[in-house]
UniProtKB/Swiss-Prot annotation:
It comes from the Eukaryota. Its main location: secreted. Ligand for members of the frizzled family of seven transmembrane receptors. Probable developmental protein. May be a signaling molecule which affects the development of discrete regions of tissues. Is likely to signal over only few cell diameters. Residues 1-17 form the signal peptide. GO terms for molecular function: cytokine activity; frizzled binding; signaling receptor binding. Glycans are attached at residues 93, 99, 291, 305. Pfam families: wnt. This is Protein Wnt-5b. The gene is WNT5B. GO terms for cellular component: cell surface; extracellular matrix; extracellular space. Belongs to the Wnt family. InterPro entries: Wnt, Wnt_C, Wnt_CS. Keywords: Developmental protein, Disulfide bond, Extracellular matrix, Glycoprotein, Lipoprotein, Secreted, Signal, Wnt signaling pathway. It comes from Pongo abelii. Gene3D superfamilies: 3.30.2460.20.
């Protein structure tokens, strides 16, 4: 009997440990920024053990790639900011709630919103690491070594210092996916389905950055004649990556896990998702009202647009509860004039405008 009690206690502690690990995330590096590599002078292991939100596998990578951690934090921050931009006019607006779990319990639901968040965060890491390589901030990588594109004109030079998206992609895959790959759930279980969903969306985010990187060129020549061009590989603006992933969010595929431990479409009539598509396994929670169990913050107190018929409109944003009107003073630059030479001088104008918030 005592041995059975010990086994039960051990299993319970293991379950709690897993829940605690899942509640925290490497995303917290965005809210608890890692200082520049000088912080590691005191030794890698103590610092890596103190960083919040890392899984065991991610801590090992931290110890091996100390100088990368600040840029992983930058990537997470970039992803979170882009998420908040893309969803600024939605009921769920990608709000951060604390420094450990970052987004709170809402990420424990395998919804479309969770799918987007995983994708855009992984994309942020690829973006940050790729740029850091080009800027010479990391000792393990440098400028891009991508082969010369076949369609590049012969008289154009290939060899500028490009963003190292190949390295950024590989490192982001190793680091971000480490948390999911070290989990061991029963084949065909809901938990395994969630792991597969996370891995799919991580990959979709990385591929968005990788696929959207393009050739950039600079002209050389007398008086801007552009008789010669030097070209290199350059990352797309991250806003464009966010726009692409938002399109993928809108067309995300509903999936379920099979007994064989694979994801399949809930509706087989739909097109099978590619590695560049987002997938989800749970319906979205009700974001209208605050709900501690789902992590929904509700829309009470959110600004809305009285004249819009879209998701930012008061009717939809406030979920039919109505809204309150208030006056707001806005200060803007106005009556700007150019003065020779060379500056622009503006006045400050105040305007009282009507604004609306959800009840």
């Amino acid at each position: 009997m005592p041995s059975l009690l010990l086994l039960f206690t051990a299993a319970l502690l293991s379950s709690w440990a897993q829940l605690l690990t899942d509640a925290n995330s490497w995303w917290s590096l965005a809210l608890n920024p890692v200082q520049r590599p000088e912080m590691f002078i005191i030794g890698a292991q103590p610092v890596c053990s103190q960083l919040p939100g890392l899984s065991p596998g991610q801590r090992k990578l931290c110890q091996l790639y100390q100088e990368h951690m600040a840029y992983i934090g930058e990537g997470a921050k970039t992803g979170i900011k882009e998420c908040q931009h893309q969803f600024r006019q939605r009921r769920w607006n990608c709000s951060t709630v604390d420094n450990a779990s970052v987004f709170g319990r809402v990420m424990q639901i395998g919804s479309r919103e969770t799918a987007f968040t995983y994708a855009v965060s992984a994309a942020g890491v690829v973006n940050a690491i790729s740029r850091a390589c080009r800027e010479g901030e990391l000792s393990t990588c440098g400028c891009s070594r991508t082969a010369r594109p076949k369609d590049l004109p012969r008289d154009w030079l290939w060899g500028g210092c490009g963003d190292n998206v190949e390295y950024g992609y590989r490192f982001a895959k190793e680091f971000v996916d480490a948390r999911e790959r070290e989990k061991n759930f029963a084949k065909g279980s809901e938990e395994q389905g969630r792991v597969l969903m996370n891995l799919q969306n991580n990959e979709a985010g990385r591929r968005a950055v990788y696929k959207m990187a393009d050739v950039a060129c600079k002209c050389h020549g007398v008086s801007g004649s552009c008789s010669l061009k030097t070209c290199w590989l350059q990352l797309a603006e991250f806003r464009k990556v966010g726009d692409r992933l938002k399109e993928k969010y809108d067309s995300a595929a509903a999936m379920r896990v099979t007994r064989k431990g694979r994801l399949e479409l809930v509706n087989s009539r739909f097109t099978q998702p590619t590695p560049e598509d987002l997938v989800y396994v749970d319906p979205s929670p009700d974001y209208c009202l605050r709900n501690e169990s789902t992590g929904s913050l509700g829309t009470q107190g959110r600004l809305c647009n009285k004249t819009s018929e879209g998701m930012d409109g008061c009717e939809l944003m406030c979920c039919g509860r109505g809204y309150n009107q208030f006056k707001s003073v806005q200060v803007e630059r106005c009556h700007c004039k150019f003065h020779w030479c060379c500056f622009v001088k503006c006045k400050k104008c105040t305007e009282i405008v009507d604004q609306y918030i959800c009840k």
